[in-house]
Amino acid sequence: MPPVPLLRLQCGVNSYDWGKVGHESAAAKYAATTAASDFSIQSDKPYAELWMGTHPSLPSKDLETQRTLLDMVQDNQALISQEVSERYGGKLPFLFKVLSIRKALSIQAHPNKKLAEKLHARDPRNYPDDNHKPEMTIAITPFEGLCGFRPLVEIIHFLKAVAPLRQLVGERAASEFENTVKGSEESEDPAVTEKNKQALRTLFTSLMRSSPESIEAATKELVAIAQNSPETFTTSSSTPETNPTNPAELAAITVRLNGQFPNDIGSFVFFFLNFVKLEPGEAMFLKADDIHAYISGDIIECMASSDNVVRAGFTPKFKDVDTLVDMLTYSYAPIAEQKLEPTDYPYAVLNAPAYSSGSSCILYDPPIEEFSVVKTDLKRQGAKATFDGISGPSIVICTAGAGKITVGPKTEEVNEGYVFFVGANAECIIESTGEDTFTTFKAFCDLTGKEDMVNGN
């Protein structure tokens, strides 16, 4: 009889400088619940990312046998399904993570499939994968980040209201941009939108090519304004209709970011990008080539299985400004268009205690084939959700409460931080065993109905 396709996973955690420190880090706490014998949380060490998947940089292991999940799915293709295995080279198509963010991650974008192949061939050390990396972020705790270019009217406002920004991009570049997009900032005509994107590209490139000396001088002035006049920061009496509603908050973030990365171009990129705040359970989706930066919070992140990053600010790591300014799409849109609204998940059945306690199964389903995520909240002891088998693999992590997970004849206890792999086509039942809400996130790949989505598009 084949083994039951339910594996408890041991997952590794990365210690990047931006991670939350010691026991403050959800990534560290979750890793510690199923840790290797040589792992213990150090109180002064940052812990940034818990990785769940088959990516070779930090592969998850089966707790019982200590074999990597990659080995196991390559030995037994049925665990991820023949179709998924053939399409994704015998590996999980997604990488599931928990990020615990204390200070800003780099301003970055992830190359699309075509560019990823080119960058990997040219520079495999800095670009270790040939795959694209669209990704989705779901907040576990309140989250702040930057995501995609702002609407053009907002960028124009900041060019007028933030003197050090205008000084840095240069009067000529600022005026040319304003004159090009004036009166057509919100046009939906494709030809006009394309013209606006090219104007934004020119302006942004001008900013990104600023000299270190001019960045330092402009930053000094910017921070002084933020500290001395927080209530009127980034506002203008001549254009009150476009003033931000939260000037003091923007001033505080400007000071905080400069404290983390002194004299960094990122403090000015901030005025080009949407400032996004997510409450727990809210999500955003980033297409390949979308510019973004995370600032603070604990999040669940799911992405196509790639570790490619093109960085250009808020980082001590390799910066590739030329590639970044060339690769971006320069699409601009309000925050609402970056957020991803979940819907009810139709392939799970809740029992009576689950229904009567207001338990829920909601689906975050981005417009790509590699992954979707279901968040389940079971709000009473004995509340149960039965998930239909799907024709692809799943990884489940518990972020709150206690319960159990059952696949076939096998039942495992589940506590906060526990991670499980569920094989393709297996019905999966989760049940709350405590009084507190039992919360799980389940990342999965099911190609059914996604035949029209071509990899990389």
Swiss-Prot record:
As given in the record, the signal peptide range reads none
Cellular compartments per GO CC: cytosol
A single GO BP term for this record reads: protein glycosylation
EC assignment: the record states 5.3.1.8
Cofactor: bound how, per the entry note?
Answer: Binds 1 zinc ion per subunit.
Q: What are the names of the required cofactors?
A: Zn(2+)
Q: Carries keyword Translocase? A: no
Pathway(s) the chain acts in: Nucleotide-sugar biosynthesis; GDP-alpha-D-mannose biosynthesis; alpha-D-mannose 1-phosphate from D-fructose 6-phosphate: step 1/2
Give the matching Pfam families.
PMI_typeI_C, PMI_typeI_cat, PMI_typeI_hel
- At the top level, the lineage of the source is Eukaryota
Q: What's a Gene Ontology MF term here? A: mannose-6-phosphate isomerase activity
Catalytic residues? R311
- Could you tell me which SUPFAM superfamilies the record lists for this protein? RmlC-like cupins
Q: What is its main location?
A: cytoplasm
- Reactions the enzyme catalyzes: D-mannose 6-phosphate = D-fructose 6-phosphate
* Residues holding Zn(2+): Q108, H110, E135, H292
UniProt xrefs under CDD domains: cupin_PMI_type_I_N
Name the UniProt key words of this record, in alphabetical order. Cytoplasm, Isomerase, Metal-binding, Zinc
Q: Please indicate if the UniProt record lists Cytoplasm as a keyword.
A: yes
Q: Where in the cell is it found?
A: Cytoplasm
Q: What does this protein do?
A: Involved in the synthesis of the GDP-mannose and dolichol-phosphate-mannose required for a number of critical mannosyl transfer reactions.
Similarity comment: Belongs to the mannose-6-phosphate isomerase type 1 family.
NCBIfam families the record matches = manA
| Record protein name field | Mannose-6-phosphate isomerase
> Which organism encodes this protein?
Aspergillus fumigatus (strain ATCC MYA-4609 / CBS 101355 / FGSC A1100 / Af293) (Neosartorya fumigata)
Q: What is the lineage of its organism?
A: Eukaryota, Fungi, Dikarya, Ascomycota, Pezizomycotina
